[in-house]
Amino acid sequence: MSVGLPGPHSLPSSEEASNSGNASSMPAVFHPENYSCLQGSATEMLCTEAASPRPSSEDLPLQGSPDSSTSPKQKLSSPEADKGPEEEENKVLARKQKMRTVFSQAQLCALKDRFQKQKYLSLQQMQELSSILNLSYKQVKTWFQNQRMKCKRWQKNQWLKTSNGLIQKGSAPVEYPSIHCSYPQGYLVNASGSLSMWGSQTWTNPTWSSQTWTNPTWNNQTWTNPTWSSQAWTAQSWNGQPWNAAPLHNFGEDFLQPYVQLQQNFSASDLEVNLEATRESHAHFSTPQALELFLNYSVTPPGEI
């Protein structure tokens, strides 16, 4: 089938187009030549569409779709995700609300008594004890386990306390109260108990350095003793004295009676003689040589002179 191309004579002129625009009310009458032109233009359009491919989705202009990087992320809320934390909270509450076994006083006494005798029970023994105390096997088993743990914890704490006490006692410095008390103040005593700095110790005692060897009792002593002055040193008095070896515990009035009788037998002349002898002895003993002789005599026994 051959399609004839329309020639230049078939195109309408501008005047005809204007006339056709003005006469819009009149129906357009197409001639057979015009039909052939329409068919040719339709075939050309089909060919161009087949030659040029359709634009792909990539070539199409993007519409206002939200960017995944800039747009806020939408969290998918599912009923399973919502139930997760609620179920966990319920489990925690169920664990906290677990009822603890409340033992009576009689049950506790029986359990403690049995624990002191035997800390580990067999299956049969636990069943017998649970039946006696109206408890379950699990309750008795749990109580014994907890009691053993408490006992071990208590033993561990006691061991730590005793070990710490021994360490503190071993590290404490040793004190010597007897040494500190026996030595006078001013001496430095080492931990070993020995005196320090013997060479630098000055052996000057203020009490000894300031001591004056003048005793007021000795200076003011009057060597006039009534017993010495009234004593008659005659052989008669010594001969008349009975030399009885009386025990020391009987030293009393019996021993003093002859001495009193001897004083009563003195006469006036004897008294004058004794007074003169006393004055002479006082003058003699007032000298330092006599004082030194008297001191030496008082210190040494009579048999060693």
Curated annotation (Swiss-Prot):
Region of interest: Sufficient for transactivation activity: 198-247
This protein's UniProt keywords: Activator, Developmental protein, DNA-binding, Homeobox, Nucleus, Repeat, Repressor, Transcription, Transcription regulation
UniProt region (Sufficient for strong transactivation activity), positions on chain: 248-305
Effect of residue 142 to I: Slightly reduced affinity for DNA
GO cellular component assignments: chromatin; nucleoplasm; nucleus
Stimuli inducing this protein: By the transcription factor POU5F1 in ES cells that acts as a direct biphasic regulator: a steady-state concentration of POU5F1 up-regulated its expression, while an elevated concentration of POU5F1 down-regulated its expression. Up-regulated by the transcription factor FOXD3. Up-regulated in ES cells by transcription factors T (Brachyury) and STAT3. Down-regulated by p53 in response to DNA damage induced by ultraviolet light (UV) or doxorubicin. Down-regulated upon ES differentiation by mediating autorepression through interaction with ZNF281/ZFP281.
Compartments it resides in: Nucleus
Sequence segments annotated as region (10 X repeats starting with a Trp in each unit): 198-247
Oligomer status and interactors: Interacts with SMAD1. Interacts with SALL4. Interacts with ZNF281/ZFP281. Interacts with PCGF1. Interacts with ESRRB; reciprocally modulates their transcriptional activities. Interacts with NSD2.
DNA-binding region, residues: 96-155
Protein family (similarity comment): Belongs to the Nanog homeobox family.
Function: Transcription regulator involved in inner cell mass and embryonic stem (ES) cells proliferation and self-renewal. Imposes pluripotency on ES cells and prevents their differentiation towards extraembryonic endoderm and trophectoderm lineages. Blocks bone morphogenetic protein-induced mesoderm differentiation of ES cells by physically interacting with SMAD1 and interfering with the recruitment of coactivators to the active SMAD transcriptional complexes. Acts as a transcriptional activator or repressor.
Result of changing residue 126 to A: No effect on protein stability
Effect on the protein upon substituting residue 142 to A: Decreased protein expression and stability. Decreased embryonic stem cell self-renewal
Effect of residue 147 to R: Increases affinity for DNA and protein stability
Gene: Nanog
Name of the protein: Homeobox protein NANOG
Location of the region described as Required for DNA-binding in the Swiss-Prot/TrEMBL record: 123-152
Consequence the record notes for mutating residue 146 to E: Strongly reduced affinity for DNA
Effect of residue 125 to A: Decreased protein expression. No effect on protein stability
Lineage: Eukaryota, Metazoa, Chordata, Craniata, Vertebrata
UniProt-recorded Gene Ontology molecular function terms: chromatin binding; DNA binding; DNA-binding transcription activator activity, RNA polymerase II-specific; DNA-binding transcription factor activity; DNA-binding transcription repressor activity, RNA polymerase II-specific; identical protein binding; lysine-acetylated histone binding; RNA polymerase II cis-regulatory region sequence-specific DNA binding
Tissue: Not expressed in oocytes and spermatogonia (at protein level). Not expressed in many somatic organs, ovary, testis, fibroblast and hematopoietic cell lines.
Source organism (scientific name): Mus musculus
